[in-house]
Amino acid sequence: MKRKAEKQQATAPVSAFAARKARQQQARLLEPEKTAQNEPAVEPPSKRARRSPEEGAARQAANENDRVQTRRSARTKAETLSSAELAEKQPQESAAAARAQTAERTPPPEKGDADTFDAAEEEEEEEKEEDILERENGVGVIAVEDDAEGYESPADDVPQVQNFPLSKTRLNKSNIVSSDERTLCVRIKEKMTLVLLGHYDLWVKRGVISLMGAKLHPSPRLYRVYAPSTHSLPVIKCVAGVDGESEIEVKSCNSGIYRLRHLSPLYQRIWNGKHTAADKLTLKKVSASTKRTFSVLYTSSDDSWNRHLRPLHLEKQWSSAIRSLSQRGGRLKVLICGPKASGKSTFSRYLLNHLLSPAPQTENNHRNTDGVAFLDLDPGQPEFCPMGQVYLAHLRSPFFGPPFTHPSLAESQDGSIIRSHHIGAISPKEDPDHYVLAAMDLMDRYRALLASYPQCPLIINYPGWIFGLGLEVATWLVKSLGLSDVVYMSEKGPAEVVEPLGHAAQEARVPLTTLPSQPTDFVSRSSAQLRSMQVQSYFHMSHPSEIHNPQWLDTTMSRTRPLVVDYAGPRQGIRGIMVMGSQISPNLLHEALDGALVGVVAVESPNAIMGQADAAGFSGSSHGDATQGAEDLSSAASDIDMNDVTDACHGDVAPTSSSSFESMIIRTPNEDLPYLFVGSGSCNPLDPKASNCLGLALVRSIDVPSRKLELITPIPASKLRDALEQGHGIVLVRGMLDNPSWAISEDYYAARAAERRHQELVAKARKETNTRDGQDAAVDADTQGMVSALLKDRIRRASNVPWMTVIEDNSRRHREAAQRKKSLWKLRKKAYPGSESETDW
């Protein structure tokens, strides 16, 4: 497996522009030195050395002969060699001089750029305050080498932030209907656009607008929109209006997702920053400290943090393909495939929203009441589930936001997961046979769904695994799934991929549509970082029943109440623990399981291991025992106790079924953990026909004396109750997912955030000391000192956790890690490099 290129190192802890100029100047200084060192002493330099103006004038005045020129060339060469030796002895002084020259040449900010300068100063101060956490290659900062399946590389030459147009509509008195500290109501003319950064609720009052593929008509419903800087910004466009205009109202929302910035640096500076020019215009009548959860942007230069912002525009060929596919209605069964970073997920999201667009209330046309089925076969970048899973979802409403804003559909009113399978890896190539069986089982579930929703179309999102064995799997799916269409997201081939797909589509009598890939070249988060953000969002998201939209909590994993379950004894709640991949010694199961992400899988049959004969059921327990165990599980607002699964699953079990499952369990010698392993060399996975993944869990601790596991999981109690009512057993599957380093560093980042908030309060209190009594001010100062000491002690304790090191110096490694957080990632779009290695792409 090839290692990806390291990020380009910063030469000095200055701004990105100054650092780039310093590198360029240093390269110019070292370039003639390297040339001189590599040349033989008897040959003249390949490029004539630069002469002084005096020498040039003298040469023009007097036409010297060849002997003089040769002597002068030799003298110039000797001077070049001596300068190279001097630079070789003092490389640090040369770099320092270059940085000093760059600092001197950097002009001070003009008066009109005060907001931008203040934002840059604020960013530098925040970077100085934050320590860099490292666990091997860095906690909280995902190392490049860790993302073996990634499709981006660090940008060697980071492009300068360009003034990119975003909104065509300019707000003024004529199109602003109303505005206050939370709401903005505006009119948009036909074919005009408006782009907002942040998260907000959108209400269409008049006219028809398009947003991320969906056409929204006037209705009383509010649509939640998430527009972070990590992805291209959604564009609100008026497609039809009353008197040529549409009217929308945008409201601030309190989803709590912004609180995740206190737990991870990946969530910092992804929402709206300081007030833009449009914000200042619409907030004239309110306090200057008022801030909405969204900002209107005319161009990318309006952003106070100078981020790489781009609008989410739809290609014309994409639009025509979406219109053509949507005309098939309930007969649509489309497979979307293509190379990595080609826009498969974006196109799938646009098509999904277009099919789920609500019909206008004034028309009597056919309305899609059966929803849309979404079969996600990409375990590395799933849309509605955390990583490592393939699933079938039934959706009833459009979604506006990246995957980390809807990492789960549990208890959601907009959709549900019909069935899910835990692959245990971010790439299907780890076990293609299991992957294909999981896809076929999900397709069978879709056919069963058609009995209740006959007009439900199907969208299949295939991963970027399109070469080698992945191409064979894709062509087999095209021939076997009974599709209506196949979409390939690349016009540049290669032919060795397009031709087999075309032959498979022709054999299945399915049209193949080829579309251009996405125009985006740079992203601000790598695929590994986006996976980390999605999993962290998954564990911190909740969906209260009394509200429509989800909420996020900033409670760290260490302070979250765990689910406690016995793994041995008469009240055993976990039937087995499986480790996918290569076989490990039972003595190492404790180390492999502790602190890992595991899949919580409901086993529907005792013969659920692939290759075994099917059995009638997992147990012979009565329905009454199962219901009793489920009622104990779902005790409201109290600890979920999975130990009562014993009552649900241990009844009059058939001897053959019990012995069949128990014979596969190996008890570890020291911890007595139920190690489930079947196979030779690698463990056979669970059969998709007899298993269903309920979600992910984090193994917080293993209490060996009491034989208990502490699990942190967002799986609703109702989902566990349903599994137990049906007599299913619970198996934990340890796969090859990314290590949850974000969970280890949450306490540290939370402690630093608390300290910063306290420092802000202290600074605010000091400004008010002149108007207060001296004795009261002294008491407040003592209290503030005590609080500061407690917060520092909290930071110290949070930084002393295992597998984490806090670096507080200003070393080169510190600066490189800080620069890594701000860098861009360049997408690799070459479909085929002429190599047989699939890991390169």
UniProtKB/Swiss-Prot annotation:
GO cellular component terms, A-Z: nucleolus; nucleus
Comp. bias intervals (Basic residues): 812-831
Entry annotated with the keyword S-adenosyl-L-methionine: no
Enzyme class: transferase
Single Gene Ontology BP annotation: rRNA processing
Localization terms from the record: Nucleus, Nucleolus
Binding-site list for ATP: 338-345
Residue span of region Disordered: 1-133, 812-841
Pfam families, per the entry: CLP1_P
Gene3D superfamilies found in the cross-reference section: P-loop containing nucleotide triphosphate hydrolases
Keyword list, A-Z: ATP-binding, Kinase, Nucleotide-binding, Nucleus, rRNA processing, Transferase
Any one GO MF annotation of this record: polynucleotide 5'-hydroxyl-kinase activity
InterPro entries assigned to the protein according to its UniProt record, in alphabetical order: Clp1/Grc3, CLP1_P, P-loop_NTPase
Ranges of compositional bias, category Low complexity: 16-28, 92-105
EC assignment: 2.7.1.-
Biased segments, Acidic residues type: 115-133
Family classification: Belongs to the Clp1 family. NOL9/GRC3 subfamily.
Function description: Polynucleotide 5'-kinase involved in rRNA processing.
UniProt protein name: Polynucleotide 5'-hydroxyl-kinase grc3
Biological classification of the source: Eukaryota, Fungi, Dikarya, Ascomycota, Pezizomycotina
